[in-house]
């Protein structure tokens, strides 16, 4: 297909997505793109990125977070919260385990038992009255 061999970049599977920029840099993809677009740019400094990748690969703690909401049965309903928690975990050197708890199933009698293993609780906002009582019970729980 008339692509010069030196312009073929391998995109191997990586254990963690954060390893991809380093893999592409090691194949000089940045230089190829800059050259093709006739752009002069300084060399990439990857020290901080490499440190992040190393941290992500060597997390040595776990945090259990209870996410109490009314849309927990929908996989992507709290995607931005999930990703924010994962990234916060990187900062504190921890794998974050999220326990999705349906707020409609919480009440004053079961909330302490349901949240007892949580290191933290997040109650994302929602619309309407459905599940609000369980959210409030979670917020007020001091087990």
Predicted regions: what is each one?
Residues 1-143:
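N-terminal beta1-alpha1 cap of cysteine-dependent amidohydrolase-like domains
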């Amino acid at each position: 297909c008339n692509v010069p061999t030196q312009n073929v970049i391998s995109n191997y599977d990586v254990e963690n997505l954060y390893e991809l920029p380093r893999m592409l840099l090691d194949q000089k993809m940045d230089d190829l793109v800059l050259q093709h677009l006739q752009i002069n740019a300084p060399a990439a400094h990857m020290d901080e990125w490499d440190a992040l990748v190393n941290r992500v690969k060597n997390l040595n703690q776990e945090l259990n977070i209870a996410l109490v909401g009314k849309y927990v049965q929908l996989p992507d309903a709290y995607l931005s919260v999930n990703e924010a928690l994962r990234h916060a975990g990187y900062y504190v050197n921890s794998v974050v385990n999220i326990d999705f708890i349906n707020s409609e199933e919480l009440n004053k009698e079961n909330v302490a038992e349901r949240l007892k293993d949580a290191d933290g609780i997040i109650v994302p906002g929602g619309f309407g009255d459905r599940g609000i009582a369980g959210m409030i019970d979670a917020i007020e729980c001091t087990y």
